[in-house]
Amino acid sequence: SWLEENLIYTVLQQVASSFHVEADAEISIECNPGTVTAKKLNVYQSAGINRLSIGLQSTNNEELKALGRIHTYDQFLKTYELARNAGFENINIDLMSGLPYQTLDKFLESLQTVIRLKPEHISAYSLIIEKGTPFYERYKFDAVKQEAGLHTEILPDEDEVYRIYKATQDVLKQAGYRQYEIS
C-alpha cells in the first residue's frame, strides 16, 4: 500500500490485458495500517483487487513499538473499518508471535481481539530474526558479547514460542478458522 494507487491500477490493468485472469481470481495486496485511504481502497477495487492482507502484527502498542512498526492498534482499526466500509469482504490480518517481551497471555489477547473482528483469514506466524537486519542489530548484545547472539532475556524462549503456537492452533480451530499454512 506504499505504492501510489494509480501505479497499482496501471500494473493490474496491464496484467489483465496481457493474460487471461479468471473472473473469480483472488487478487490480494499487502497493506500497512495507517497507509490506506478510502481513495486507495476504491482504486484497488477498480483494479480488481478483492483481498486485503493487513499487517497488524499485534494489538499491543508496546509490542508494535518494540517491532519498530509505524502504526498503533487504533490506526489499524481505522484501516480495517475503511476496508469494510469500502466493501472488502476478504480480509486477512497478520499476527506475530515470539515478539520482545511477549507472553502467551499477551499473544492470546491479541488473537482473541482479532477474532472478534471476524476477518476471513488470520495469518499467525512466529518472528524470525535474520542476522544483518535492523531488528537483529537493535536486539543484539553489546560489542563484547555480539558473538553470543541476541538479547534472549527479552525474547520468549523456545518453550514459550511453542506454547503460543499450539494455543494459536487450538484457539483458531475453535473459532472456525482452518489452518492451511505453517510459518
Which residues are covered by each model-predicted region?
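C-terminal scaffold of the Radical SAM
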Residues: 1-183
